[in-house]
Amino acid sequence: MSFLCSENSYQQQSKISIDIDKSLKNHKLKLEEEIRVLIYGQKKVGVTTLFKTFLLMGESQITPEELMDNRNNVYKTIINQLKKFIIISNNSKIELENNNNIQMSNLILELDSENFLWNKEIGETCLKLWNDSGIQKIFQSQFSEFFGYFFKHLQRISDENYTPTPQDLNFIKLTQNGIIEGKFTFERCLIKMIEMGIQTSTLKKWINCFSEVQAIIYVIDLSVYDIVESEDCSKSINKLEKSLNGFKEIIESKYLHGCGVIVFFNKKDIFREKLKTVPFKTYDKDYIGENDFESTTNFIKNKLLDYYSNPNKNVYFLINEESEVDICRSTFNILKDIVLNITYNSVKN
């Protein structure tokens, strides 16, 4: 894991950390209190994959009894999500592949989500519909990738001896507004991580829901610097620029002004390879730096820092370069530093 930037030197950070520890001890404040983190990024930048990595690396706070008690909730979640896809298909021009799939979709719609018995046949029906090209088109164009979690695990879930995993339960908590959260511990710190899978167009509607978070992890896909997508019939935008604009919108929100910020640069391997054949000038024609990894990432970093006007807080930059354990450890070390600084500043004030 590489640290591209921190506003203070490591020596300064160490001194600050010592001062903060003293203040925390004097005021009997404990870091063991819950650290609340929002993880966000544009569609398909790898937010859900990173979120699942954190959940898997952390220690679950869910008991075995709670796992079994939620078995039916897993089944209900699958049916309700599949119904959403089917209803969209029925109300749009996106048709299912054949009459057999249409008949199966009608059977799913007729199921009472609150009162039905899951069996192998229902599982097979759900899998066939999930693999339908029409359902896939709806999923890929209109839903965050975590909506597909249970469908990708249908074979395991349909086993008669199925017991939900802690990760399954975290994904049950998916709500209609596209928000999912998970609680876990990492190195004795209790983490509450929230993934915001909603679209950018509805961000302002929900951003006030996250006023209590202490840190933001904003994920950026480096490899899309040459890709332009259409937002509507009259407007198109570069995908990297869209991510940078999303970062600007997040950090300018009055509800998140007090948060620490971690920018997570993702898909660096694809980015490195693409630079060999696609000049970075494709993204910015005025770019005059070298066409190498370090120069281009520093350019992106500086653009993000230009958006960030809070002199009392650091922006941390991470690149996904090492093992999952190292990813988590580096991230959580920064989170602890962020929370300690927030606590220290509140003590001073």
Swiss-Prot record:
GO biological process: adenylate cyclase-modulating G protein-coupled receptor signaling pathway
Naturally occurring in which organism (per UniProt): Dictyostelium discoideum
PANTHER family xrefs: GTP-BINDING PROTEIN ALPHA SUBUNIT, GUANINE NUCLEOTIDE-BINDING PROTEIN ALPHA-6 SUBUNIT-RELATED
G-alpha domain residues: 33-349
Span list, region G2 motif: 168-176
The encoding gene: gpaJ
Lineage: Eukaryota, Amoebozoa, Evosea, Eumycetozoa, Dictyostelia
Protein's name according to its UniProt entry: Guanine nucleotide-binding protein-like alpha-10 subunit
Region (G3 motif): 191-200
Region G5 motif, residue ranges: 320-325
